Amino acid sequence: MQKIVQNQTTESLIRKDLQKFSAYSSARSLKVDGDIWLNANESPYNDEYLYNRYPEPQPRKLVEKLAKIYDVDASNILVTRGSDEGIDLLFRLYCEYQKDSAFAVEPTFGMYKIAAQLQGVDYKTLKLKEENNFEINITELLANIPDNCKLLFLCTPNNPTGKSIPLADIEQILSELAGNCVVVVDEAYIEFSNEKSVSSIINKYENLVVLRTLSKSFGMAGLRLGVVITNSDRIVWLRKILAPYPIPKTTESTILAMLDDENLANIASQIIEIKEQREHLYQALSQMKIVDKLWSSDANFILVRFRESIFNKLIDNKIVVRSMAHFFNDEKVLRISIGTVSENKRLIEVLQKLSSEYETK
């Protein structure tokens, strides 16, 4: 394991009013063995699932399973109710109301801005250039980050562009911002990319936080489980401000069952299929006259600009995609998720028909 090369960020950047904060001590946080539990005002009437009892603050078996999957230590993991909660926790831990700022490139995932607004944090952005293929210029990025920035969000692969940030570039950013800013790398779509996860360097860079999710490649969006991966000191602080019992027992047991070896093998196969279908859809789109611009993607979606607005026409064919008009001020730009083989086949058929109609106008 690599040694931490910076050690000043966790304590020094935390909100001043939280520096001596004492977390709520729940009944379940008491680490003792007992046969008769009379300390939490729960119903004493048990069933076989023990649903009358509060769950663990951080479900041990689930945390250990995820640590194995992500190849990190269990002390480096915090499970949350979706990545949105992880994002919110970071704002609450580090950013002071109407004093600090957060930074991101755009277009990117919209919840960073929402979380900033809810906490009264100034949200600054650097607009990625289409002519540069939406790739980040590290020098330009660093030059635009304000001095009062506590959190920098990097989504890789980025939503909605699908572009990955090379690990070497992220390391450069981490080094430049050490001691001054926490770098939050959102890897919601990393399983679809060929880039290596930055979770491998969490113990090298103290100012690194990684966000993972079970909502995308793992196919568990309905179970709402996010994962924060960072150094153990920061995990301790995040646990202090996290709700006492965030993960229901039913969520834990369902996810553990879905993370057995057989299901993990199926998930790996599905990821391969998504990548193959992504390439298949990309090639099909590249042949259509109705397509104006097409961007390659490392995620499970493709960003496309069409020559005319087809969003409602797709809905008329019972196909729902995501409009990117709010990012690009252009209703012809769509983000299309990669579906099953049959779903993609139907999508291509409809798009080919729309393209033929466009050509005859």
Curated annotation (Swiss-Prot):
It catalyses: L-histidinol phosphate + 2-oxoglutarate = 3-(imidazol-4-yl)-2-oxopropyl phosphate + L-glutamate. Its EC number is 2.6.1.9. GO terms for molecular function: histidinol-phosphate transaminase activity; pyridoxal phosphate binding. The keyword Plastid does not apply. Gene3D superfamilies: Aspartate Aminotransferase, domain 1 (3.90.1150.10), Type I PLP-dependent aspartate aminotransferase-like (Major domain) (3.40.640.10). Pathway: Amino-acid biosynthesis; L-histidine biosynthesis; L-histidine from 5-phospho-alpha-D-ribose 1-diphosphate: step 7/9. Homodimer. Belongs to the class-II pyridoxal-phosphate-dependent aminotransferase family. Histidinol-phosphate aminotransferase subfamily. This is Histidinol-phosphate aminotransferase.
